[in-house]
Amino acid sequence: MTKTVRSETDTFGPIDVPAAALWGAQTQRSLAHFRISSEKMPPELILALARVKRACAEANRGLGKLDDAKAAAIAGAADEVLAGRHDGEFPLSVWQTGSGTQSNMNMNEVLANRASELLGGRRGPGRLVHPNDDVNLGQSSNDIFPTAMHVAAATQVKERLLPSLDLLRHALESKAEAFADVVKIGRTHLQDATPLTLGQEISGWAAQLALSEQAVRAALPMLCQLAVGGTAVGTGLNTDPSFGAAVAARLAEQSGLPFESAGNKFAALAGHEPLVFAHGALKTLAAALMKIANDIRWLASGPRSGLGELSLPENEPGSSIMPGKVNPTQCEAMTMLCCQVLGNDAALAIGAASGNFELNVFKPLIAHNFLQSARLLADGMDSLREHCVDGMEANRARIAELMARSLMLVTALNPHIGYDKAAAIAKHAHRHGTTLREAALALGHLSAEQFDAWVRPEDMV
């Protein structure tokens, strides 16, 4: 009869583990003790941990600390994790020890058991590779987990967030160019203002994204400073003095990111300023995206009783009771996820500010929030671009209608008749329901020819 469990042992003694699982005793204890909510350790962080463990094995081999066979087996097991072959082996909750120790040990146990099998051994008692002595050699959760946090964050920013941001910015720049000839009324304080082109308005959105991109890129160098080599409290106890630099060099070579060993390991363990700063850049991007999405849905409001200056793609029915209704759903999704990012920033900052002495113990929260924000923003920008911006069109007739009705075109008269007379024309037109031209002639402040020559919206942009 096939056994469904096997016995694994740690310093607390034996514990039953599912026979098919690659994890060991400490992972099993964490599963038992932290049955909290449904948030699991982010997959991006798991992959980063695997990359870090592979680099550590290679560095230890290079330093003569780990024999070739074990190092190759650990690296091979890590490669399997990176290939997605063991996704189910990392079941731990985000809400665990604040150092991430249990997830570090989860990775150590999985790699040790799988490396043992790759060497022809078994998993569990009698394994050929030890999770602490071999996989975790020269390391502590206190330096390895924050190292993985930085690797995951920098990787997601480079590979997911920035490409999505770039594509959305280019899509908006394309629309700005396409609508460069569409003169429309501007709005400030939600009231009519002087004209601009729709292209100019959209160019502002694109420029907001460009500024946000600058902020995100400025944060990358700090994320590339790694804690590895600091071990328990930053002194580097029980590791080779060159270990941190060796690991960082391997990670840099494999990723194309300029990873390097942090100059001060005490700060790297006890504080998380790089992630606070980087998430601040994500918050900046979220603020810009929320403004852009709100502008788009307001300009598309209607279709008959709103502004109606933009037409958006009709992707799905909008109401379960009102037939034919179509809503700006992509904008709504974007604004919701931006709210989540702003909330993530507050929680992340509180966590980063709450370290004590030589260690911050809010690391899983910080990692979870950062990676969720990066994921939300990247996916949200892709969705907004594909299902909204690319198909967005200008309602030229409606724009012209609203332009003709606006009282703020009177601003063009200021240099010719002065502010007070121009204001009197606007108030007269509003009070009597007439056009500006009719009001100007009624008050006798200028001739019809002068009005037609001076009030030209296309000359006001």
Swiss-Prot record:
CDD domains: Fumarase_classII (cd01362). The keyword Cytoplasm applies. Gene3D superfamilies: Fumarase/aspartase (C-terminal domain), Fumarase/aspartase (Central domain), Fumarase/aspartase (N-terminal domain). It catalyses: (S)-malate = fumarate + H2O. One of its GO terms (biological process) is fumarate metabolic process. One of its GO terms (cellular component) is cytoplasm. Keywords: Cytoplasm, Lyase, Tricarboxylic acid cycle. Its EC number is 4.2.1.2. Substrate binds at residues 99-101, 127, 130-133, 140-142, 188, 320, 325-327. InterPro entries: Fum_hydII, Fumarase/histidase_N, Fumarase_C_C, Fumarate_lyase_CS, Fumarate_lyase_fam, Fumarate_lyase_N, L-Aspartase-like. The record marks E332 as: Important for catalytic activity. Pfam families: FumaraseC_C, Lyase_1. It comes from the Bacteria. Homotetramer. There are 2 substrate-binding sites: the catalytic A site, and the non-catalytic B site that may play a role in the transfer of substrate or product between the active site and the solvent. Alternatively, the B site may bind allosteric effectors. It comes from Chromobacterium violaceum (strain ATCC 12472 / DSM 30191 / JCM 1249 / CCUG 213 / NBRC 12614 / NCIMB 9131 / NCTC 9757 / MK). The active site is at H189, S319. Belongs to the class-II fumarase/aspartase family. Fumarase subfamily. GO terms for molecular function: fumarate hydratase activity. Pathway: Carbohydrate metabolism; tricarboxylic acid cycle; (S)-malate from fumarate: step 1/1. The keyword Zinc-finger does not apply. Involved in the TCA cycle. Catalyzes the stereospecific interconversion of fumarate to L-malate. PROSITE patterns: FUMARATE_LYASES. Its main location: cytoplasm. This is Fumarate hydratase class II. It is found in: Cytoplasm.
